[in-house]
Swiss-Prot record:
Belongs to the complex I 20 kDa subunit family. It is a peripheral membrane protein. Its cofactor is [4Fe-4S] cluster. GO terms for cellular component: chloroplast thylakoid membrane; respiratory chain complex I. This is NAD(P)H-quinone oxidoreductase subunit K, chloroplastic.
């Protein structure tokens, strides 16, 4: 062992014995080797891209972005996920080797965001497709929040046991409520509902008799001349 990296090794730990388990050793080795697969579809990914620069320097956590899911053990979803993109995202997740983790970044990824109100093609939460380990809310989250999410994921990995990995597999997952669509009649028929129009119709000048309208108009004109 290199004594330069461990200067106190000869003085203190020369005859020491380190006892651990294979599970803890495996977790410790994976803490500094999280290789993320970047899945950015919207503006949240711009905030994550700033982490690559020298200001935040996310390389200190051992994060090495990979372009292939077969070389990654962390997928970071940032942005809106649509119905058409759902099969591709699920395929990328299935191609990642075990153990694998997911960070949902941004409101659009977690709940569908502002696009989930009237959109028929937006997935209302990426956890309906793949299991999520860390939720990172925000629109968009700051780079400091992304670092905090990675730190929390590292703490989760350090305490992980083999049974936890089994529970996260698709066959043992509890899915959330699926999308429920119903076909309704079209309201854009070009015809007005007369009953509804009469109910919410506000009074206008067209309902005032002509003689009354001109009477008040002449009175207002005379007062303006006096003033």
């Amino acid at each position: 062992m290199n004594s330069i990296e461990f200067p106190l090794l000869d003085q203190i730990a020369q005859n020491s014995v380190i006892s651990t388990t294979s599970n803890d050793l495996s977790n410790w080795s994976r803490l500094s080797s999280l290789w993320p697969l970047l899945y950015g579809t919207s503006c949240c990914f711009i905030e994550f891209a700033s982490l690559i620069g020298s200001r935040f320097d996310f390389d200190r956590y051992g994060l090495v972005p990979r372009a292939s899911p077969r070389q990654a053990d962390l997928i970071l979803t940032a942005g809106t996920v649509t119905m058409k993109m759902a099969p591709s995202l699920l395929r990328l997740y299935e191609q990642m080797p075990e153990p694998k983790y997911v960070i949902a970044m941004g409101a659009c990824t977690i709940t569908g965001g502002m696009f989930s109100t009237d959109s028929y093609s937006t997935v209302r939460g990426v956890d309906k497709l793949i299991p999520v380990d860390v939720y990172l809310p925000g629109c968009p989250p700051k780079p400091e929040a992304v670092i905090d999410a990675i730190t929390k994921l590292r703490k989760k990995i350090s305490r992980e046991i083999y049974e936890d990995r089994i529970k996260s597999q698709p066959k043992n997952r509890c899915f959330t409520i699926n999308h429920k669509f119903r076909v309704g009649r079209s309201i854009h028929t070009g015809n007005y509902d007369q009953a509804l129009l009469y109910k919410y119709k506000s009074p206008s000048t067209s309902e005032i008799p002509p003689e009354t309208f001109f009477k008040y108009k002449n009175a207002a004109s005379s007062r303006e001349l006096v003033n």
